[in-house]
C-alpha cells in the first residue's frame, strides 16, 4: 500500500495475479482498458457484444505478456446475461479484482443533427440510450461483478466510464448526456455505500473522457481532404490541446485507478 515509508513504485502500480473484467472490450476505449490491465499484469475477462474480430486483433497485438485474456460475448441490454457472466468469470478465474465498464454509446436515432431538434426525435432510441449507458453499461455490471468483490480481503476497484458530456452541453446528445450524468452520480453513491457498509477497500470511480474517436468511421470525423468535419471540429476547438485524444492515453489513468496507487481514492469522476 501507500502507507510504508519506502515503497516499490512498480509494485504499487502492478496488477499481477489479479483478474479484471472489461466491458465493451471490442471498442477503442475498451481496447485501451484491456491493454492497460494486461500490461499491468492482470488476467482479463474481455466482454463484447459485437466486433469480435477487432477484439481478436487486439489480443493478437498484445501478444504473450504472461496473462490470460479471455473473450466473452455479453449483451449489455440483458441483466441476466451480465449476471451469468459474473458467474462464468468466477468459474474461469476464481475471483474478480477490477471491473472497467466501458460499454455504452449512442443508439441510432437518439441524437439530433444540425437539421433537427430534440422535438423531432422518437422516444424509443432515447430510452434505449439511457438503458445502454446507465443500466447495461454501469448499474447492472456494478451489481453483478461488485457482488463477487464484497469479501475480497484486498478490496478491489470498479471503474465506470462517464463522459465530458455529463458536465458540458454537447449539441445533439441529450439522452446520452443525461445517462452519463447518472453514471457519475451513481459512481459517487455506490462508492460511499460499498466502503461504509461492505468493504472499505472496495473503491468505485469513474473517468470522463473528452473527445476520443472510439470506433467512429473516418468519414464521420474527416472530410476527404483530411480536415475535420464540422462536428469533429467543434470538439477539437473545445479541447485545450486542440486535438482528439488517443485511446491509449487512457492507459495510465486506468492503471492508477485499478491499482493500489489510488488506494485512498473513491467516488470521483
Which functions belong to the PLM regions below?
Residues 11, 56, 114-116, 198, ...:
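A glycine/serine/threonine-rich, flexible loop-to-helix segment
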Residues 19, 26-27:
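Conserved glycine-rich cofactor-binding loop
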Residues 243-269:
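C-terminal substrate-recognition "lid" of short-chain dehydrogenase/reductases
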Amino acid at each position: 500500500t501507500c502507507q510504508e515509508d519506502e515503497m516499490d513504485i512498480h509494485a504499487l502500480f502492478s496488477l499481477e495475479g489479479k483478474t479484471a473484467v472489461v466491458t465493451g472490450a471490442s471498442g477503442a476505449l475498451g481496447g485501451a482498458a484491456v491493454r492497460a490491465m494486461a500490461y499491468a499484469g492482470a488476467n482479463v475477462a474481455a466482454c463484447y457484444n459485437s466486433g469480435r474480430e477487432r477484439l481478436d486483433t487486439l489480443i493478437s497485438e498484445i501478444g504473450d505478456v504472461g496473462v490470460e485474456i479471455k473473450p466473452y460475448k455479453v449483451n449489455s441490454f440483458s441483466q441476466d446475461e451480465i449476471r451469468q457472466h459474473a458467474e462464468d468469470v468466477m468459474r474461469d478465474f476464481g475471483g474478480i479484482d477490477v471491473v472497467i465498464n466501458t460499454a455504452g454509446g449512442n443508439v441510432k436515432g437518439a441524437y439530433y443533427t444540425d437539421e433537427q431538434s430534440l422535438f423531432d426525435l422518437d422516444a424509443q432510441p432515447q430510452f434505449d440510450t439511457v438503458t445502454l449507458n446507465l443500466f447495461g453499461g454501469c448499474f447492472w455490471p456494478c451489481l453483478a461483478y461488485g457482488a463477487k468483490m464484497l469479501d475480497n480481503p484486498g478490496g478491489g476497484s470498479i471503474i465506470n466510464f462517464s463522459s465530458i458530456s455529463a458536465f458540458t452541453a454537447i449539441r445533439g446528445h441529450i439522452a446520452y448526456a443525461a445517462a452519463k450524468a447518472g453514471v457519475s452520480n451513481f459512481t459517487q453513491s455506490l462508492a460511499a455505500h460499498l466502503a461504509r457498509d461492505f468493504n472499505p477497500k472496495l473503491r468505485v470511480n469513474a473517468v470522463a473522457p473528452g473527445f476520443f474517436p472510439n470506433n467512429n468511421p473516418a468519414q464521420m470525423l474527416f472530410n476527404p481532404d483530411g480536415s475535420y468535419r464540422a462536428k469533429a471540429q467543434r470538439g477539437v476547438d473545445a479541447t485545450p490541446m486542440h486535438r482528439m485524444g488517443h485511446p491509449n492515453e487512457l492507459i495510465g489513468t486506468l492503471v492508477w485507478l485499478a491499482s493500489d496507487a489510488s488506494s485512498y481514492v473513491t467516488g470521483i469522476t
